[in-house]
UniProtKB/Swiss-Prot annotation:
Annotated GO CC locations: cytoplasm; nucleoid
Entry protein name: Transcriptional regulator MraZ
Family: Belongs to the MraZ family.
Alphabetical list of SUPFAM superfamilies matching this protein: AbrB/MazE/MraZ-like
Primary localization: cytoplasm
Gene: mraZ
UniProt keyword Glycoprotein, yes or no: no
Pfam families the UniProt entry points to: MraZ (PF02381)
Lineage, uppermost ranks: Bacteria, Bacillati, Mycoplasmatota, Mycoplasmoidales, Mycoplasmoidaceae
Length: 141
């Protein structure tokens, strides 16, 4: 399970170093894809397969389904985690997420989000309260 917030940096070679607490979870290869609100999402390959299956259940006859799948999956990348826990972020994803040097990793239970620190701070500053969102979500199943 992935929990917590981690402040890290993007090095000159476009790599991030996973914090020690996350390295065991992401051994070998990972999948990085474009997420929502200008972040990237990181999953184990088997978890990415489950994520894909959720989208694959949507009717492909609907234009929004095709568009969403293209936007998320066309730029997804399998990436290796090296023995030092470093991950090379592909240039297209760096551009999609507007990543600069300061990065924030956000645990989302089953996946990790990669945010540019400034964009994440702006997102938090403009977000509604926990209570407001929870109240609105009470009937969602």
């Amino acid at each position: 399970m992935l929990l917590g917030t981690f402040n890290i940096t993007l090095d000159a070679k476009n790599r991030i170093s996973l914090p020690a607490k996350l390295r065991a979870f992401f051994e070998g290869s990972i999948v990085i894809n474009r997420g929502f609100e200008n972040c990237l999402e990181v999953r184990k390959p088997q978890d990415f397969q489950k994520y894909f299956e959720q989208f694959n259940s949507f009717p492909s006859t609907q234009k929004d389904t095709r568009t969403l799948k293209r936007l998320i999956f066309a730029n997804a990348n399998f990436v290796d985690v090296d023995t030092a826990g470093r991950v090379l972020i592909p240039n297209n994803l760096i551009n999609d997420a507007k990543l600069d040097k300061e990065i924030v990793l956000i645990g989302q239970f089953d996946h990790l989000e990669i945010w540019d620190k400034k964009l994440y701070e702006d997102y938090l500053a403009n977000s509604e309260s926990l209570e407001t969102v929870a109240e609105r979500m009470k009937d969602v199943k």
